[in-house]
């Protein structure tokens, strides 16, 4: 990788799962993981990439799982949204400790804790080089944080949605269970939907398809992968339309 890389993308939307914040703890938030992620995001900011960020809440709460155990689904989803706000606040703190300006916006009004989501304000902040962390999902139950990430990416005119996962892309089967699973370097939205490959929920993929928003699935734990993508490197799996050139 060159010492002074040129960015390929001006603005991206990065989706992190809540589980990635746990580290080896198994629950909650590992500050060491936050600091590592802040450092990697800081590398992007340092070369002029504008970063929007969405973090899941699965390290703290999973509404869908508890709804199956009897908790009202809407109540559970609202609790899950609050978990994403907690993660967003923790990430903001880590970014600020690394001298990276950041703002948390929430789809649910939380005066005195976060800013309320405002697209025009988010665009201004991104233009000024601040990292904007979008929390509380879409603000509506039954929508995942994957859908929220794609929605926010489309709204703020990101050029690419990046989904960080535990594995280095999308496979034909679960590589943890099936050693013969094959990794795809490229996929179309249609193939993901038809074969239900489980990259994201289908609502998120349909949204990206409708708005021609490319998605790249990559392994966050791989050192330098995030920076490599934004300077044009080939990491993980790219999902796009049939007629779209390499994103």
From Swiss-Prot:
Principal subcellular localisation of the protein: cytoplasm
Q: What does the entry list under GO cellular component?
A: cytosol
Q: How is its activity regulated?
A: Allosterically activated by GTP. Inhibited by UTP.
- The enzyme's main class, written as a single word, is transferase
Top-level lineage group: Bacteria
Query: Catalytic activity, per the record?
Result: UMP + ATP = UDP + ADP
Involved pathway(s): Pyrimidine metabolism; CTP biosynthesis via de novo pathway; UDP from UMP (UMPK route): step 1/1
Q: Which family does it belong to?
A: Belongs to the UMP kinase family.
Designated name of the protein: Uridylate kinase
Q: Which organism is it from?
A: Saccharophagus degradans (strain 2-40 / ATCC 43961 / DSM 17024)
